A protein has these predicted regions:
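Carbohydrate-recognition beta-sandwich/jelly-roll modules
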Residues: 1-309
Length: 309
C-alpha cells in the first residue's frame, strides 16, 4: 500500500520462527492455496497445501500473474490468477480450468479450496480487530486471550438447510454480507468475495486459538458438498459420501482493498468501503425516496400479568 507505506503480507511474516506453531501449522499459514480432496472409495478427505504439497508454475499476465499449483499426489492442478488493479488485489479461480485426473468412484475430487486465507494476518504484538458481518456486525479483537474458545465460522447467506448437523452449532447471527475487514493500528483493509460467495465460509481465529501466535481471517469455498453418516448404530466409524458431478460454482474470486483514511481507521471506514464497492462496482442503487410523511403513528400495547405476592 504505497499511499500509507504499509506492507501487507499474503502469508504471515516470520511465520517460520513462530515457536507456538507446529510444522503442519507453519505450512498451513505459509500456503497461498489450500485444498481438500475427497476419495469416494475410501470415504475420506485429505488436506493439501501449496507449501510442501504442490509444484508451482508462474506465468506473467496483464497486471498480474497466473500461478498453477500442481498437486501430484492427488492428480489435481489448480490455476489461480492474481491481478493488481488501481485500488485492490484480486485472487480468482475459474473452476473449469481445474484439472482432476480421475473423478470416478476410485479417484480423487476437489471438495473445497481456500486462497490467501492468511492474508493480512496480525501478530501477537499488533493492536486491532477483524470486522465480521455477523448479524449487524461484530468485532473480533486481536490477541483477546480466548485461546480455548471455538474459532469463528460463518457460512455466507447461511448454511445448507438440507444438511443434517452432526453437532450443535455455535450461537451466532446470520452472515448476510460476503465481506470482512481488518483494522490493524493505523492501517485497514476491506475484503470482499465477489464471485462464488454463495459457497463461501468465513473463518476467524485469534492468536493461540489459531494454534499459532497469529490472528487470522479468511474465506473457504465449498465446491462439492459431502455428508457423513453412521451405519447399524456404530458411532465409532463415520462414512463420508461426496456430491457427484461438476463443481457447483464457475468462478471463485476475492478482492483485497487497502483503505486510505485521513485519521486512524476504524470499522466505520470498512463499512464505508464496502458501501462504495456496492454502489460503484456491484451496481447497487439507492431506492430510498425523501418524503414528508403526513402522519406519524405510534402503537403501544400491554398485558395483564398475574404475580404471586
Amino acid at each position: 500500500d504505497k499511499a500509507k507505506d504499509k506492507m501487507w503480507w499474503s502469508t504471515p511474516e516470520n511465520v517460520g520462527h513462530d515457536k507456538t506453531a507446529t510444522n503442519t501449522i507453519v505450512e498451513d499459514l505459509s500456503s497461498s492455496l489450500k485444498m481438500v480432496y475427497g476419495e469416494p472409495d475410501a470415504r475420506s478427505t485429505t488436506n493439501m497445501r501449496s507449501r510442501g504439497d504442490a509444484k508451482i508454475k508462474v506465468k506473467d499476465k496483464s497486471s498480474g500473474v497466473k500461478i498453477t499449483y500442481s498437486f501430484k499426489k492427488a492428480g489435481i492442478t489448480v490455476p489461480v490468477t492474481y491481478t493488481l488493479e488501481d485500488d485492490y488485489l484480486e485472487a480468482k479461480i475459474d473452476t473449469a480450468d481445474i484439472e482432476e485426473e480421475d473423478t470416478s468412484q476410485s479417484g480423487k475430487l476437489v471438495t473445497s479450496l481456500s486462497v490467501l486465507s492468511s492474508f493480512g494476518a496480525a501478530s501477537s504484538a499488533d493492536t486491532g480487530y477483524f470486522v465480521i458481518p455477523d448479524g449487524s456486525g461484530a468485532l473480533i479483537r486481536f490477541n483477546n486471550g480466548k485461546k480455548t474458545a471455538k474459532s469463528y465460522t460463518g457460512y455466507v447467506y447461511g448454511s445448507d438447510v438440507t444438511a443434517v448437523a452432526q453437532t450443535e452449532p455455535a450461537v451466532t447471527e446470520q452472515v448476510y454480507l460476503p465481506m470482512y475487514g481488518i483494522v490493524n493500528g493505523d492501517n485497514a483493509m476491506m475484503v470482499v468475495c465477489t464471485e462464488g460467495d454463495s459457497n463461501a465460509k468465513l473463518t476467524a481465529s485469534v492468536s493461540g486459538q489459531s494454534k499459532s501466535s497469529f490472528n487470522i481471517c479468511g474465506f473457504d469455498f465449498t465446491v462439492r458438498d459431502s455428508d457423513t453418516y453412521y451405519m447399524s448404530g456404530d458411532n465409532s466409524t463415520a462414512l463420508t459420501v461426496f456430491e457427484d458431478g461438476d463443481m457447483k460454482t464457475d468462478t471463485l474470486a476475492v478482492r483485497y482493498y487497502p483503505l486510505e483514511t485521513e485519521d486512524t481507521p476504524d470499522y466505520t471506514d470498512v463499512a464505508e468501503a464496502y458501501r462504495n464497492y456496492l454502489t460503484e462496482e456491484a451496481g447497487v442503487t439507492d431506492t430510498a425516496e425523501d418524503t414528508d410523511p403526513g402522519l406519524y403513528l405510534n402503537f403501544y400495547g400491554g398485558t395483564i400479568k398475574e404475580k404471586s405476592v
